[in-house]
Amino acid sequence: MPIVRSRSWVAAPIDEVFAFFDDPTNLASLMPPPAQIRLLSIDPAPPRPGSVFQFRYGVGPVQRTWTVRLVDRVPNRAFVDETLSGPMVRFHHSHTFRPGRRGGTWIEDRVDFHVGPDGRMGAAVDALAGLVMRLTFVWRHARQRRLLRG
């Protein structure tokens, strides 16, 4: 399975950074245009391991429902979510937060994913999806730095 890793530093304390990422409505502010995402529901709320989120995700008129489960959550340290149904066959996203220099925070992401189908075509689609994710993280890092200045 392909893996995308990303790491960025923001000039904000870890409790503030975790609180920002712990609020699923903030995900929309981290998506590069023209992608759009909107939270439809959380059950149960507030977010905790086992919570299921439904989002509406897409580009322009091409939209679909994306259902995600929160697998693990350690306040001010980490959380893990995985896709139950949506644009990928597998999407397992680990978010880790570590204290950084000058009171800032390191944000580390690891995404294990598979778009499908299997075989050569799937490998090509996964490679393209990996590239899109890497570019998304580049945009997201710049956005995080602006939103989380501490």
Model feature map: region roles:
Residues M1, H92-H95, F137-Q144:
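Secondary-structure boundary/capping motif
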Residues M1-R48:
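Hydrophobic ligand-binding cavity/cleft-lining segments
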Residues I3-R5, Q63-T67, V89-H93:
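Short, surface-exposed coil-to-beta transition loops
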Residues R7-A11, R56, R69, T96-R98, ...:
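Generic structural detector for well-ordered beta-strands
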Residues V10-A12, V59-P61, D72, P87, ...:
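Beta-strand elements of well-folded, non-transmembrane domains
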Residues L39-S85, W106, W139-A142, L147-G150:
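Glycine-rich portal/gate segments that line the openings of hydrophobic small-molecule binding cavities
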Residues V80-L135:
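Beta-strand/loop substructures that line and gate deep hydrophobic ligand-binding cavities in soluble
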